[in-house]
């Protein structure tokens, strides 16, 4: 969501690409669409949980690389920025569907209500986070990637916690049987 609120400023003001902005926006959206399309095949091969793990690690790594390379410098060339954003959003394309499907697993019997609840929660969380990060995006796109970095690090920490909790529960059930 932070990208949606800052993309126009980054491309039109920071890079002076007012006329090209719709094409740039569409190009990055294609990376999400491509990942979503590929996800149908890859999730069968690797599983939802692995796809989430790999995608989060990719998202985190790309953010970290961008932040290290461009900390304290001016914006990189538009080609470099678009490459990083395209790869970031390619990772997001895998995350969206798989995270929603994983969230729906325990409440599949009430899928309609479950989808509404998970959509509501993700939006309620995304708005203040994107508003906060978006306030720092001026003159450079670096705060956008720092926001990606922090949010993906927190997501990985939550994922590790949930995997360990799932493992503990599984071990407890096996011991009691």
Predicted feature descriptions by range:
Residues 29-37, 127:
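Residue-level signature of mid-helix packing/kink "hotspots" within the transmembrane helices
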Residues 162-177:
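Intrinsic disorder in cytosolic terminal tails and internal cytosolic loops
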Residues 100-140, 147-148:
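A late C-terminal transmembrane helix in Major Facilitator Superfamily
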Residues 35-51:
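Helix-to-loop junctions at the C-terminal end of transmembrane segments
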Residues 145-160:
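Symmetry-related core transmembrane helices of the 12-TM Major Facilitator Superfamily/SLC fold
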Residues 50-99:
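C-terminal transmembrane helical hairpin of 12-TM major facilitator-type secondary transporters
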Residues 26, 30, 86, 116-124:
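Transmembrane alpha-helical cores of Major Facilitator Superfamily
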Residues 1-25, 32:
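Extracytoplasmic gate region of multi-pass secondary transporters
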């Amino acid at each position: 969501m932070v990208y949606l609120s800052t993309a126009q400023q980054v491309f039109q003001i920071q890079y002076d690409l007012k006329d090209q902005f719709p094409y740039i926006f569409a190009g990055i959206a294609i990376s999400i669409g491509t990942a979503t399309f590929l996800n149908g095949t890859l999730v069968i091969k690797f599983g939802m949980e692995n796809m989430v793990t790999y995608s989060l690690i990719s998202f985190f790594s790309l953010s970290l690389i961008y932040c290290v390379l461009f900390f304290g410098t001016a914006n990189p060339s538009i080609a470099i920025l678009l490459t990083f954003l395209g790869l970031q959003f390619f990772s997001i394309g895998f995350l969206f569907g798989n995270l929603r499907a994983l969230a729906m697993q325990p409440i599949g019997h009430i899928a309609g209500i479950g989808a509404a609840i998970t959509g509501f929660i993700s939006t309620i969380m995304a708005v203040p986070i994107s508003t906060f990060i978006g306030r720092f995006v001026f003159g450079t796109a670096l705060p956008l990637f720092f926001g990606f970095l922090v949010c993906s690090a927190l997501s990985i920490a939550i994922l590790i916690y949930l995997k360990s909790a799932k493992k503990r529960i599984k071990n407890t059930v096996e011991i009691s049987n």
